[in-house]
Every structure is written in structure tokens, then in C-alpha cells.
From Swiss-Prot:
This is Transcriptional regulator MraZ. PROSITE patterns: SPOVT_ABRB. The gene is mraZ. InterPro entries: MraZ, MraZ_C, MraZ_dom, MraZ_N, MraZ_sf, SpoVT-AbrB_dom, SpoVT-AbrB_sf. Residues 6-52, 81-124 form the SpoVT-AbrB domain. Belongs to the MraZ family. SUPFAM superfamilies: AbrB/MazE/MraZ-like.
Amino acid sequence: MLFRGRSHRSLDPKGRLMLPPEFRDILLSRSEEGKLVLTSFDGCVVGYPYPDWVEFEDKFNRLKNPSRKMRDFRRLVIGGAEEMTADPQGRVRVSRSHMDYAGLTKDVVLVGQGSRFEIWDQSKFDAIVAQDFDDVTEELAESGIDFCF
């Protein structure tokens, strides 16, 4: 099972976020008790099922002589990672540091990205989807992926 689709949600005043039922089901199928990791990257908060996160972290930590930029990336992504389990109501708590990094306000969008999901501020996400993606479809075609409708 992969994370797909979008879900519009609201953060409560304590930073709690109700996960969509489909996302909760995926977490429960991929990790004991629905354990997950939240971290920040690319202007949003990123959620991984715990086993997928451990695999990513292990691969990253095996890099030999990482560049300064890679070490800084590790500080942001791994240093900012927070393990958690959803509460009985299916909520996770997004930390103040993640909310600040991603500019999250009350209205957010959860976006499935296959093995992970992203949490975007609604207005930032609206700007992303309003872009013209013609150049991306050309790039996909050059990579052998036909994405024409």
C-alpha cells in the first residue's frame, strides 16, 4: 500500500493533526502500532512509516565521506526527525519547529507521495499546483515516461 491522494485538514491549537483514515491504515499495515517519523524538508513536513525511515537513515549513515552540504542536509532531516504514534483518535502532533519550518498555519494539505506523505500549508500548496508543468511533461518524455492525456 502506498500513500496517494490529497486530504485537506486543520491543525488544532496544540498542533495536532487528524490523519486521513487511508493514511492511518497504511501506517498500521507498514509499522507496528502505526509508528511514524516526521521530519522537515523541501518547505514541508514529511511523514514516513517507521520501518521506511529506519531504512532511509541506515542508507544515509553508510555514506562514506559525505560533503559539507550532505552533512548539513543530515542535520536538517535526520536531526529534525521525531518518532511518534498516532493517538487513539488518529491524531499526530506536529512540533512547533516543524510548523515553523514549513510555515504551517491552521489549514493544511496532506499529500501522498508513495512511500511517504507530505504536510503542506494550504496556501503554499495552492501556489505549487497553480504552476505550469509543461516543462515537466517534456522532461518526463525525455526520460521515457509518457504522461499525455
